[in-house]
């Protein structure tokens, strides 16, 4: 067996085109003959084109000592695309004329264009000694145009290990009834991003009735400081198997810290001319807990009949450690004596969504 180097590349193209023309003749309307909505024609078109390019390189070296195994993988992916749509609505057309371009009253006209791009690089390495001691390390770098300059990149490393205790020589006497015993420690980072584009620039749209004429009005407040929501997770897991895995259990203990949580529609003072931010990084939160999964494989069997059982037990506790005061003002409610409504509060150093009866 020799060293093995493998390359895999693929390109995916997604194309979407939609066209819709509608006509609402005068005969179907119950409005007056001179109403603005009769003899109405609408033309709508929507187009999008997106490319996803992925390149993967995998290297598996050959060791003379078969107790060792190693594999490393690198991957690059680029996603880019554009979309646009246009809608024109014309009313008051002469009988028999169905084209919006024929003229008439124009109660509505809109268009939209969007361009997006994201990419990531990822690297991972896997090492095992006698399949008893296993170590994994990875790193991922993400970039997206959903954030502004200086905030677009996120780095997400992770490390984990596994010790198959049951394979140790000194565990030989337990293998008649203990088929699996392993310990899995791990640490890693992940991130979240908003689902809207162009949040970091000022956007404008046409607005009518500005001193009797059409003008431009701002649509949003640009968000220059918006950044990745980051999650840091520690986990320790245990895998157990009994009697050739007829009974299996996995136990996980974890703690997770979320920094710069993203929240939609954060209310702000109307003196700015707007009522909310589309997105904001509003706070931090801690989660910790445990989870136990218990599975049986043909534990109860008689002839061709058998029964499998699955149980899950879990417990999670969270705590808000930092929160934007504007969010606290928006989410916190007051006691209403008439309907005996309990007081729901988001309060620092307390669980999220705590309910108070006073």
Features from the language model and the residues they span:
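N-terminal, polar/charged subdomain of small-to-medium soluble alpha/beta proteins
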Residues: 30-31
């Amino acid at each position: 067996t020799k060293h093995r180097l493998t390359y895999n590349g693929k390109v995916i193209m997604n194309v979407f085109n939609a066209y819709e023309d509608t006509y609402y003749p005068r005969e179907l309307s119950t409005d007056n003959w001179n109403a603005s909505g009769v003899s109405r024609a609408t033309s709508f078109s929507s187009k999008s084109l997106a490319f996803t390019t992925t390149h993967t390189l995998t290297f598996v070296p050959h060791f003379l000592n078969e107790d060792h195994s190693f594999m490393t993988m690198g991957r690059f992916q680029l996603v880019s695309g554009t979309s646009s749509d246009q809608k024109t609505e014309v009313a008051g057309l002469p009988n028999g004329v169905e084209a919006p371009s024929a003229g008439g009253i124009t109660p509505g006209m809109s268009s939209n264009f969007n361009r997006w791009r994201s990419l990531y690089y990822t690297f991972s390495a896997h090492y095992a000694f006698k399949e008893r001691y296993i170590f994994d390390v990875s790193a991922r770098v993400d970039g997206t145009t959903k954030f502004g300059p200086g905030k677009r990149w996120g780095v997400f490393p992770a490390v984990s290990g596994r010790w198959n205790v049951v394979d140790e020589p000194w565990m030989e006497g337990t293998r008649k009834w203990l088929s699996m015993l392993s310990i899995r420690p791990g640490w890693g980072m992940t991130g979240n991003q908003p689902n809207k584009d162009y949040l970091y620039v000022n956007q404008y749209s046409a607005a009518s009735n500005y001193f009797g004429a059409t003008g431009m009005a701002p649509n949003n407040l640009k968000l220059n400081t918006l950044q990745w929501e980051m999650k840091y997770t520690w986990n320790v897991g245990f895998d157990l198997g009994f009697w050739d895995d007829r009974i299996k259990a996995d136990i996980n203990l974890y703690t997770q810290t979320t920094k710069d949580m993203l929240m939609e529609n954060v209310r702000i003072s109307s003196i700015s001319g707007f009522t909310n931010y589309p997105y904001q990084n509003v706070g931090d939160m801690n989660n910790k807990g445990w989870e136990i999964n218990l599975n049986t494989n043909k534990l109860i069997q008689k002839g061709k009949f058998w029964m499998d059982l699955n149980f899950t037990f879990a417990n999670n506790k969270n705590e808000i450690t930092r929160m934007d005061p504007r969010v606290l003002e928006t989410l916190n409610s007051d006691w209403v004596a008439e309907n005996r409504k309990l007081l729901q509060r988001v309060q620092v150093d307390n669980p999220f969504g705590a309910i108070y009866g006073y």
